[in-house]
Amino acid sequence: MLDQKDNLLSSYNYDLPNELIAQSPTKSRHDAKLMIVKDGLDDSLNLVHAKVWDIKDILKPADLLVVNNTRVVKARLKIRLSGGGAGELLLMEPRGDGRWLCLGRPARRMRGGDQLWLDMSRDNSLILKVIDKDERTGGRIIQFSNEFTSWTEMENILDLCGEVPLPPYIDKDKSSDHEESYQTRFASKPGAIAAPTAGLHLSDELIENLKTRGIKIAQITLHVGLGTFRPLEKEDLSQLHLHSEWIEVTEETIKAITNCKEDGGKVFAVGTTSVRALEAAYLSGRGALKPYEGKVDLVIKPGFKFSVIDGLLTNFHLPKSSLLLLVSALIGRKRMLKLYKQAISNKYRFFSYGDAMLITPESVI
C-alpha cells in the first residue's frame, strides 16, 4: 500500500560515500558483486550476497533475459564558439533536415543565429548554426549539413571528432578504455548517449554459459537519453514527466516472451530500460504485448502495475532518480532504501560501472 511519502522526490534520497562510486568496471564483467533480493515483505531484507557470475545458477532453463541492444555513440563534440572560446555539444536526437537537439555548454553563449565551428582537422572545420532553444529540455537545436539526418549518417563525424559521453561522476582520466567497457556485448543499434548499464555485467563467457543451460536471451532497443538520466527536480511526483526516448520491441522478442511464459518460465529484464520498453509496448497494445516502434515517456513509480516482466537485473542508482522510482515500484520504497543501506555497509560499488542487484519474482510486491 502506498503512503504519502511515496509521491515525494525527497523520499528517494540516500547518502553515499564518494569512494563507493565505481570509476571503472571489474576486471571481468561478471565479477561484479550481486545482491540477490529474495522473498520478503517491506520490513524484511531476505537477501543473498553473490557475484553476477552466479546468476547462471539462479535462473532456470525456461527463463528469459531481455537485454537492450542500443549502442552508445560518441556524441560529445568539442566546438569553437562565435566570439572565441571553447564549448561543447552533446547530441541528443535528430530532428530532421540536418537539425539535432543538443545540450550545449556554455548554453548562455549559444543563442539563436550564432555560428559554431567543429574542427574536423587542422585545415577543415564544419560550420554549425544555433537555430533556437528547445524550451522543454533547455537544449539547443543545432543545424548541421542536411545530409546528417540520422545517427548512421553522423557516424563518420562522431568517429573522427566525438567522445564517449561518460557520466559526470566518472573521472575519465582514471578509468579504462571506455569505448569498449562502456558498451554491452549486445550493442548493435547506435543511438544511446548513456549505456544500459545492467547489460555491462554480461560477459561473453556468462552469455554462452546461460545459453548452454537453456536460458534464452531476447533483445529490445531503447536509445538511452534524457528520460533515463536527467536528474528529477519537482518534489511532487504526481507531476512527473520524462523526456521521450525511442524504443523498438520486435515480433521476435514478443514470441520469445510468450514462449517463456507458456513454458512456465520467468521474464527477467536486464536493466530498467528493458523494463520501460516492454511495459510501454504492452500499454500501447491496450492490454496485449504487440510489436512497437516509436517514442515513449512512460513513468514507472510505486503503484505501477507490471504486466510483462517478472524480475530485474539492475545496478545501484543515483538518489532521487527515475530509475530509483522504478526499482521501488517493484519492491517498495522502504525496502529499497533498506537494501541500499545494506549495499553501502557491504561496500557495494554504485552507478554505471558498479555492482548489481537481482530482484527475483518472489520479491516483487
Swiss-Prot record:
It is an enzyme of class 2 (transferase). Transmembrane segments: none annotated. The keyword S-adenosyl-L-methionine applies. SUPFAM superfamilies: QueA-like. The keyword S-adenosyl-L-methionine applies. Keywords: Cytoplasm, Queuosine biosynthesis, S-adenosyl-L-methionine, Transferase. GO terms for molecular function: S-adenosylmethionine:tRNA ribosyltransferase-isomerase activity. GO terms for biological process: queuosine biosynthetic process; tRNA wobble guanine modification. It catalyses: 7-aminomethyl-7-carbaguanosine(34) in tRNA + S-adenosyl-L-methionine = epoxyqueuosine(34) in tRNA + adenine + L-methionine + 2 H(+). GO terms for cellular component: cytoplasm. Its EC number is 2.4.99.17. InterPro entries: QueA, QueA_dom1, QueA_dom2, QueA_sf. Monomer. This is S-adenosylmethionine:tRNA ribosyltransferase-isomerase. It comes from Prochlorococcus marinus (strain NATL2A).
